[in-house]
A protein has these predicted regions:
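N-terminal leader/targeting and pre-domain segments
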Residues: 1-19, 100, 104
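Thiol-based oxidoreductase modules, predominantly thioredoxin-like and allied folds used
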Residues: 2-5, 24, 40-43, 47-61
């Protein structure tokens, strides 16, 4: 299940966890929900990754500090370090391999 984060300080807090996926979305983006649902379904077998949505329309600071120029954007972090960033086109196999590598 994907949780929503609204407060910038919470975003910083979760990026410092072991393995986290953040999906940057917009309220006006029609494909964002589809991508988020696909990511959630594809990641069900990975129990060690936490998944979060952040609406960039509601959080300008997140958009600016994390350099989100388009949505949807998927960010994967481990212990405060960005491991992966993908926007618009998503290589699900690459995401799976990365999560598998860092969750073992």
């Amino acid at each position: 299940m994907i949780k929503e984060i609204k407060i910038y300080d919470e975003i910083i807090e979760v990026t410092n966890k072991n393995l986290v996926m953040i999906i940057a979305k917009s309220h006006t983006c029609s494909s964002c929900n589809t991508i988020a649902n696909t990511m959630d379904n594809n990641m069900k077998h990975f129990d060690k990754i936490e998944k979060f949505n952040v609406f960039v329309d509601d959080n300008d600071r997140f958009r600016g500090e994390f350099l989100i120029f388009s949505v949807p954007t998927v960010l994967i972090f481990s212990e405060g370090k960005e491991l992966l960033r993908q926007s618009r086109y998503f290589d699900y196999a690459k995401i799976d391999r990365l999560i598998e590598m860092f969750s073992s």
